């Protein structure tokens, strides 16, 4: 007897969702949105952290949606306690204020799977589908198997002292590191970037998240790392020790090689593109200089970056993919691995060292092949 996909899905138990938000309006809105997806079932609501704690103790849930800003115990504090006592998938709800963006990035670093923006202009069908998919995918994951707190902030003077040697130095050999990440990427990047050479090849990253979040994330990384972390600027030469994040400005970020080294440039968004900025767009822009490039694709939902990594690998780049065990969502790296684009599949705690060694190996090769003038 024939059965279609929807009929098959109806036999799969729905993922149980607990909504935690002090706003009754937001709780009602979110319940309505999630009710449109048969894969999800809202099993409870809580207006504050205490109610949420009591509910979790007595009732099973596969995923929690958690407001960041609540009276009493904040969502961020509750998340921190939850991850210590009973780790489970959490999707944060945040406003687009500066305070909300900073807290959202902290939440993603502390173990939240994803962060959804609260609506500002009414109900939207595409937004509804996106929220349902992200909550469902979060419910299918487990908290990343990373040690929380590894990326603690360094003393304020440590990064400045280490930056002095790299400041203003162009990357003459042309080496470049490219990284793409999505869901789970904040904690993954905080595991990778500290292990890179602080005076080494520049790094350009596409991390899927709203623009305000990217600004907060770049500032957070800049406080944590000896590297110089900032959002990409068009036409500015990339220097040794730079870590550049593609901004969320409605345009894609590409890299281009000039006489004085690598630069970033912005290109118009393709309406057909699912993500902006796009990992694929970044990766494809470096194919002509692939032999100078090391590239990594980290945890994330979907397939953005897989085709671009394949083209880079075919053109001579060194490629790395995060393994399934340490990925929050084994989507982007899975597709890239399936295409044969990933040359080295590694747990997240080994990718930073592998990227660093790949650039050191490139530098040694360059020195061996450089002709030395006769004396």
From Swiss-Prot:
Subcellular locations according to the entry: Cytoplasm
Reactions mediated catalytically: [protein]-L-glutamate 5-O-methyl ester + H2O = L-glutamyl-[protein] + methanol + H(+); L-glutaminyl-[protein] + H2O = L-glutamyl-[protein] + NH4(+)
GO CC list: cytoplasm
EC number: 3.1.1.61, 3.5.1.44
Keywords: Chemotaxis, Cytoplasm, Hydrolase, Phosphoprotein
Keyword rRNA-binding: no
Location of the CheB-type methylesterase domain: 170-362
4-aspartylphosphate: residues bearing it: 67
Modification after translation (UniProt): Phosphorylated by CheA. Phosphorylation of the N-terminal regulatory domain activates the methylesterase activity.
Residues at the catalytic site: 182, 208, 304
Domain Response regulatory: 16-133
Keyword Ribosomal protein: no
Class of this enzyme: hydrolase
GO MF terms held by the record: phosphorelay response regulator activity; protein-glutamate methylesterase activity; protein-glutamine glutaminase activity
GO BP term, example: chemotaxis
UniProt xrefs under InterPro entries: CheB-like, CheB_C, CheY-like_superfamily, Sig_transdc_resp-reg_Me-estase, Sig_transdc_resp-reg_receiver
Its job: Involved in chemotaxis. Part of a chemotaxis signal transduction system that modulates chemotaxis in response to various stimuli. Catalyzes the demethylation of specific methylglutamate residues introduced into the chemoreceptors (methyl-accepting chemotaxis proteins or MCP) by CheR. Also mediates the irreversible deamidation of specific glutamine residues to glutamic acid.
Similarity comment: family membership: Belongs to the CheB family.
Free-text domain note: Contains a C-terminal catalytic domain, and an N-terminal region which modulates catalytic activity.
Protein name per UniProt: Protein-glutamate methylesterase/protein-glutamine glutaminase
Organism the protein comes from: Roseobacter denitrificans (strain ATCC 33942 / OCh 114) (Erythrobacter sp. (strain OCh 114))
């Amino acid at each position: 007897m024939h059965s279609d996909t929807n009929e098959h899905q109806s036999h799969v138990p729905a993922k149980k969702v607990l909504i935690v938000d002090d706003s009754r309006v937001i709780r009602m809105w979110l319940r309505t949105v999630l009710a449109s997806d048969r894969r999800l079932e809202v099993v409870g609501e809580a207006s504050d952290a205490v109610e949420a704690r009591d509910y979790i103790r007595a009732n099973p849930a596969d995923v929690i949606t958690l407001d960041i800003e609540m009276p009493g115990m904040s969502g961020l504090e509750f998340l921190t306690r939850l991850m210590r006592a009973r780790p489970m998938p959490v999707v944060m709800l945040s406003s687009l204020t500066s305070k909300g963006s900073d807290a959202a990035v902290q939440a993603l670093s502390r173990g939240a799977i994803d962060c959804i923006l609260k609506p500002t202009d009414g109900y939207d069908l595409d937004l509804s589908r996106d929220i349902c998919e992200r909550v469902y995918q979060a419910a299918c994951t487990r908290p990343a198997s990373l040690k929380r707190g590894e990326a603690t902030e360094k003393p304020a003077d440590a990064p400045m002292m280490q930056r002095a040697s790299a400041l203003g130095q162009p990357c003459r050999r042309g080496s470049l590191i490219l990284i793409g990440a999505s869901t789970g990427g904040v904690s993954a990047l905080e595991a990778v970037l500290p292990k890179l050479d602080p005076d080494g090849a520049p790094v350009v990253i596409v991390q899927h998240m709203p623009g305000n979040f990217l600004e907060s994330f770049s500032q957070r990384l800049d406080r944590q790392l000896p590297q110089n972390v900032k959002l990409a600027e068009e036409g500015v030469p990339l220097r040794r020790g730079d870590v550049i994040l593609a901004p969320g400005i409605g345009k894609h970020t590409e890299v281009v090689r000039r006489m004085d080294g690598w630069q970033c440039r912005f290109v118009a968004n393709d309406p057909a593109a699912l993500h902006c900025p796009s990992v694929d767009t970044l990766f494809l822009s470096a194919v002509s200089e692939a032999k100078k490039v090391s590239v990594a694709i980290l945890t994330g939902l979907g397939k953005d970056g897989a085709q671009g990594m394949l083209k880079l690998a075919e053109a001579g780049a060194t490629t790395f993919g995060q393994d399934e065990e340490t990925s929050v969502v084994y989507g982007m790296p899975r597709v890239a691995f399936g295409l044969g684009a990933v040359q080295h599949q590694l747990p997240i705690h080994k990718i930073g060292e592998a990227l660093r060694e790949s650039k050191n190996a490139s530098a040694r090769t360059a020195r061996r092949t450089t002709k030395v003038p006769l004396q």
